A protein has these predicted regions:
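Glycine-rich active-site loops that engage anionic ligands at enzyme catalytic sites
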Residues: 14-97
Length: 97
């Protein structure tokens, strides 16, 4: 399962960029198998895999027709939304267990 593989690789430091005013994304060097089964409502804090090498962290709620593989969710959504939307475009996120 993709989420399990992602967890096995933690901690993981990813340099991310802004996209569409609702997400931060970063490319990982070691690919993760995807099932690309999730599309629809994206929630604040959703952590997704796009393709097999793009980690996406969403900080705004919206609907998408694109398919993602769900990896997890940030627990402190309110704090995330406030801090990450104001963050510099060249940001590094460290994911830990």
């Amino acid at each position: 399962k993709s989420a399990d593989i992602f967890l096995e690789r933690l901690p993981l430091k990813i340099k991310v960029k802004e996209l569409n005013g609702n997400e931060k994304y970063g490319i990982i060097s070691k690919k993760i198998p995807s099932d690309r089964s999730y599309s629809g409502n994206i929630e604040v804090g959703d952590l997704m895999l796009y393709g097999d090498d793009c980690i996406v962290l969403f900080y705004k709620r919206f609907y998408t027709p694109y398919s993602y593989t769900k990896l997890g969710r940030v627990v402190e959504k309110d704090r995330l939304q406030k801090n990450i939307s104001e963050a510099d475009h060249n940001l590094e996120i460290i994911f830990t267990k």
